[in-house]
């Protein structure tokens, strides 16, 4: 039996999740929703994906352009087993009563507060916690990036301090900024630390800045260790951690630009880099402190987590079988 999946919201995350669903042999994409007939809606239709209006109020927008929709979100909910809510932050919580009324499982994204779901999720860290659940929240791109690497070294970590250098906007976003400033998040610590703690029990504090770039986030991480660990140990751990890749400055990876170019060279859709990129040379140990720097492709690192969450919620596979299946289907390198 294939799980019937709907995607509510077909923007940066939604269209990538929808694509990923089509690559699974145990899932079926039933349809997606849009609020207006923009180029993404037309492209979905060209791909043969049924397009639904996000609500009745948006139907006139489609009728005005002669764009025939398959129905509304409520109609889509009647046909699916699960809905992946990829709407803007805060909208998912407002949509939850619709999903509850329809008796449909739902996955929310990191823009929602943790209490929208029964569990916050990163597959390699807490897959089992989502088994059989009705509502799961896949944490944000930044939180996913932190959890991926920190969960791998958690047994050695006493306290984590991380500085988040966040991209200002996604490449197709013309509404956000800044374009000529560095904007600190003056609420210290930032929300990222507590968000990590919704997935793994770890002592962590974070600070954040927004900088004028669209490509990736960068994290500068310092870990106070409670157990001895060498640089080579950390390199070995990360080399054997799924969805984490080591990049070397000596091989030309001296910025996020080259890392994104690497993703383009893989010929992946939308130059997705599902893996967290760690600069190998940045891994260092001074006394009882571990340092490393990582980059996060904010448009795509959460996509495999959404797929694994679906499998966990329907208990289709155990943790590593699901991760391996997702990795293979999306061409994830390890």
Swiss-Prot record:
InterPro entries: DapB_N (IPR000846), GlycerAld/Erythrose_P_DH (IPR020831), GlycerAld_3-P_DH_AS (IPR020830), GlycerAld_3-P_DH_cat (IPR020829), GlycerAld_3-P_DH_NAD(P)-bd (IPR020828), Glyceraldehyde-3-P_DH_2_arc (IPR006436), NAD(P)-bd_dom_sf (IPR036291). Pathway: Carbohydrate degradation; glycolysis; pyruvate from D-glyceraldehyde 3-phosphate: step 1/5. It comes from the Archaea. One of its GO terms (cellular component) is cytoplasm. Keywords: Cytoplasm, Glycolysis, NAD, NADP, Oxidoreductase. NAD(+) binds at residues 12-13, 111, 167, 298. Pfam families: DapB_N (PF01113), Gp_dh_C (PF02800). It is an enzyme of class 1 (oxidoreductase). Its EC number is 1.2.1.59. The active site is at residue 141. It catalyses: D-glyceraldehyde 3-phosphate + phosphate + NADP(+) = (2R)-3-phospho-glyceroyl phosphate + NADPH + H(+); D-glyceraldehyde 3-phosphate + phosphate + NAD(+) = (2R)-3-phospho-glyceroyl phosphate + NADH + H(+). D-glyceraldehyde 3-phosphate binds at residues 140-142, 192-193. Belongs to the glyceraldehyde-3-phosphate dehydrogenase family. Homotetramer. This is Glyceraldehyde-3-phosphate dehydrogenase. It comes from Pyrococcus horikoshii (strain ATCC 700860 / DSM 12428 / JCM 9974 / NBRC 100139 / OT-3).
């Amino acid at each position: 039996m294939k799980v019937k999946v709907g995607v509510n919201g077909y923007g940066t995350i939604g269209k990538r999740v929808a694509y990923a669903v089509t690559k699974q042999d145990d899932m079926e994409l039933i349809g997606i929703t849009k609020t207006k007939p923009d180029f993404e809606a037309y492209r979905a239709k060209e791909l043969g994906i049924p397009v639904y209006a996000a609500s009745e109020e948006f139907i006139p927008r489609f009728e005005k352009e002669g764009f025939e929709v398959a129905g509304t979100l409520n109609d889509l909910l009647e046909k699916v087993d699960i809905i992946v809510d990829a709407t803007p932050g805060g909208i998912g919580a407002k949509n939850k009563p619709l999903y509850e009324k329809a008796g449909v499982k739902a996955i929310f994204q990191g823009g929602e507060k943790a209490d929208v779901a029964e569990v916050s999720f990163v597959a390699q860290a807490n897959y089992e916690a989502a088994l059989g659940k009705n509502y799961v929240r896949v944490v944000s791109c930044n939180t996913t990036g932190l959890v991926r690497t920190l969960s791998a070294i958690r047994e050695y970590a006493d306290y984590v301090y991380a500085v988040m250098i966040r991209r200002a906007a996604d490449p197709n976003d013309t509404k956000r900024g800044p374009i000529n400033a560095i904007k600190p998040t003056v609420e210290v610590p930032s929300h990222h630390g507590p968000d990590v703690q919704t997935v793994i029990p770890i002592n962590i504090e974070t600070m954040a800045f927004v900088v004028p770039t669209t490509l990736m986030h960068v994290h500068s991480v310092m870990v106070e260790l409670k157990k001895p660990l060498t640089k080579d140990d950390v390199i070995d751990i990360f080399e054997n951690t799924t969805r984490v890749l080591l990049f070397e400055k000596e091989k030309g990876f001296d910025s996020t630009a080259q890392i994104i170019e690497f993703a383009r060279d893989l010929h992946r859709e939308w130059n997705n880099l599902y893996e967290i990129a760690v600069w190998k040379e940045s891994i260092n140990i001074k006394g009882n402190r571990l340092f490393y720097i990582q980059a996060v492709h904010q448009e795509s690192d959460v996509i495999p987590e959404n797929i694994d969450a679906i499998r966990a919620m329907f208990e289709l596979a155990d943790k590593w079988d699901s991760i391996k299946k997702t990795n293979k289907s999306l061409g994830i390198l390890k």
